[in-house]
Amino acid sequence: MPYLFSKSVHHALLFRRPVVRLAMTAPLFLLAACTSVPLPPWVPELPRPVSRTNTFPTPVPVEPAVVVQTMPVAPPAPVAVSPVEDPLPYSPAVAARFPAPTVVYSTPGLQANRTNFTTQDELHAWLRDQVAALSRSAGVKAALLPIGASQQGRALEALVLTRGSGTDHASLLTTGRPTVLLFAQQRGDEPAGSEGLLVLARELAQGLLQPLLERINVVIVPRLNPDGASRGEALAAGGQDIAQDHLRLDTPEAQALARLVRDYQPMVVVSAGEYRLSGAYPQKFGGVQKFDALMQYATTPNLPEFLTRAGEEWYRRPLLASLKGQGLSIEWSHSASSDASDRTVSMEGPEPVNSRNAEGLKNAVSVAIDSRGAGLGRLHIQRRVHTQVTAITSVLGSTAQRARELSQLRPYLEKEVAGLACKGQVVVLAANTPAQYDLQLLDPTTGADKTIAVDWDSALALRTVSSRIRPCGYWLSGSSTPAVERLRLHGVKVLEVIEPSALLGDLYREAPRPAIAQSGRLARQGVAAGPDVALVRGVVDAPAKSFYVPLSQPLANLVVAALEPDAPGSYLASRLLKGLGDVARVMAEPTVKTQELP
């Protein structure tokens, strides 16, 4: 059955004045179930001006594959009480724009008169209760899996929900149903996502969302950073930002999530976070951030084009409609720098270090949903949780509706990516594209909508800063074990050289290169910038006990991001590789004798 996409694409949304126009391709995009059918080319188009009265696109009409309630559901016997809220950081008129929802969500951390959110012990008990409830019923199976420990020894756990024969990863894979991975609170001061996932865990296990499990499997990690959550602080115990550690995998928390992804192979990954109200907006633009949610799917170089189309038409558009139906507002993920002279507002960038982009490079539909609330304490907490529950319920419903297509999509993408080895070009460094945008804020005094025109760095059509011929694979020195271990955590196939060999390859040499404007943003995000390099064609000596990483595998694009030295956040830039002599590009299929690492 071919996959049908509408002619309009997401880049026609919400922009005020286009800077560049690119040609559109055919109005229909077809992908046959047979993987021999080539994916049609797709050239993104920078947005055209649109009327401000039609901010949200109409969702693509889809015949539901299963009839379930996918709007937020009220928990049993809710108690209509007002939670303890923090002092207002803005005027009462602005606060009035964020009324509590009609539904009252009930988790341990959302009870009346609480000053803290769900504790680690309460979270464990809540998840355990969902497993216990399902043990008394037939059909749905549940398990609470230990997936690791935080830097301070707190348990990291995942709740698995399925109608398969078991809850281990092999059983989920044999169901033929797509698996959705939901995780939250990788920054400890972003609690709404965690509380929302507890609500969804109960509704999937015992409530009105349980019928979705006829079509999908769900894995939930409600809290990835329990150490930060215990302090109400963003960073992990060692001071790392877990949100920027999904390529390097330096923290045990990010490693635990990577192992879970490697084993359960989710087709859809959702990161539920919160965005922080920034003082830069009132100072530079005279307005307060207004949106209940910011959302962005993977926007990084070398993504399969079909993932971008699926993220837009199968997920983002229905999600917009769901939030709008609940009276909630949403915008692309964006931020402004604290530099008073810099009036640019930027979408999240193409760097592969966050989960949104890293999981996209693993051929999953990867989405980041951030509610309005980091740093707000308990202020508007019911609305923030309502935003998360509404948005993620839409993602679950979209996955159930597209379950058959998504199950066909994974083998197609894996074959396509693996088949690109030794062919064409690969983008090493990309940047957002400058544009103009009408951004809505709130008047800080009256709370009324306020629209301003801003310089806008768009991630919807990336600029290629540097690219080179795609190699057949990469050679790594025998001293590159730390990098090899991280690649294998991701699920990358790595071969060990058994007999000394000579390989035709490109060697890296340091070479000056003009600085790019994005380097300042990389520094603000804590992303290591790679060195400036030039390529020298030559012979690579591959001794025994060195390594070969072929690109003829499904995770080839993740390998490129990790091993091209000048890619942002690369393993050389982040010092998992010691120097340029530890890595080389192999430019012809090697005949070297190797064995796959166990």
Per-range role (PLM):
Residues 2-5, 13, 21, 34-598:
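M14 metallocarboxypeptidase catalytic domain recognition
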Residues 19-25:
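Sec-dependent signal peptide recognition
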